[in-house]
Amino acid sequence: MNKANDYTLGVEMIPLSMGEFFEEIDHIRDAIRQIEDNVGRIEMLHQQSLQEIDEANIAATTRHLEGYTSDTRRLQTSVQLAIRSLESQNMQLPPDNDTATRKTQTEAVKKKFMDQIRHFLQIEKTYRAQYEQRMRRQLEIANPRATEDDFQTAINEENGGQVFAQALLRSNRSGEARTALREVQERHADIKRIERTIAELAQLFQDMATMVQEQEPMVDKIVTDAVNVRTNMGEGTQHMDRAIKSARAARKKKWICFGICVVIICVIVAVLCGVLIPVLGNRH
């Protein structure tokens, strides 16, 4: 996980050793714990923001929220890439006990990560509803005659709060109404930020759920390559076996020829001896 930012999606990776694998699992667990801590702080800051009435304090709380949300997004991306990498590696390995252990451990951290995404998603949805309630109350203070359509415009349109605010500021409403209106604008920004986070979390959860299907083409290629390698190795072994047999046969033939030559030489020597010895004896 400490190298998670170096992972490239869809690129084959050499499987880690068992020691490296468990080290990676520990890194992922640490990152998930950090995400849990961040989400706890985000929840606390949401509650604090709802209770604040001072503009400066609200702005400071918003900055903290944005910081923790950004850091959590970064950690989630790293964890997603790390789990994706481990799943890809697991699919390249033979079906033995070590591979079963890897798959079990990978699935465990993946489940924990997805549970954490669900938890964060629920928190954001809960506080989005509370921000809307707070915004509605402030709108009612700012403009008691505001309709449901006015409220929906202020909530849903990107610049709805600002448009509503400008219309009211041109009126003769009291200072209390104008103060409430400033909070409406701030809550509108909070709601939009939460909506973006909710959309990102929902997409992340979906990506994690469909990760295996996305990897299938890559895995098929890995398996095909592995089969081709084994086939080529098998063919190479067969060729080598034939070459060895041919070499052995050639050596055997050479020894046979050598033996025949030796026998022929011996016969020739014997014949010569049988002829020459009597002749030499008669001369004497």
Swiss-Prot record:
Q: Can you provide one Gene Ontology molecular function annotated for this UniProt record?
A: SNARE binding
**Top-level taxon of origin:** Eukaryota
Q: Which GO terms describe its biological process?
A: ascospore formation; ascospore-type prospore membrane formation; exocytosis; intracellular protein transport; vesicle docking; vesicle fusion
NADP keyword on record:
no
**What Pfam families does the record tag this protein with?**
SNARE, Syntaxin
t-SNARE coiled-coil homology domain residues are: 181-243
**Location in the cell:** Cell membrane; Prospore membrane
Q: Where is the signal peptide?
A: none
Which membrane topology term applies here? Single-pass type IV membrane protein
Instruction: Look up keyword Coiled coil and say if it applies.
Output: yes
Gene3D superfamilies in the record, alphabetically? Answer: 1.20.58.70
- SUPFAM superfamilies in the record, alphabetically? t-snare proteins
Q: What is this protein called?
A: Syntaxin-like protein psy1
Naturally occurring in which organism (per UniProt):
Schizosaccharomyces pombe (strain 972 / ATCC 24843) (Fission yeast)
Q: Which gene encodes it?
A: psy1
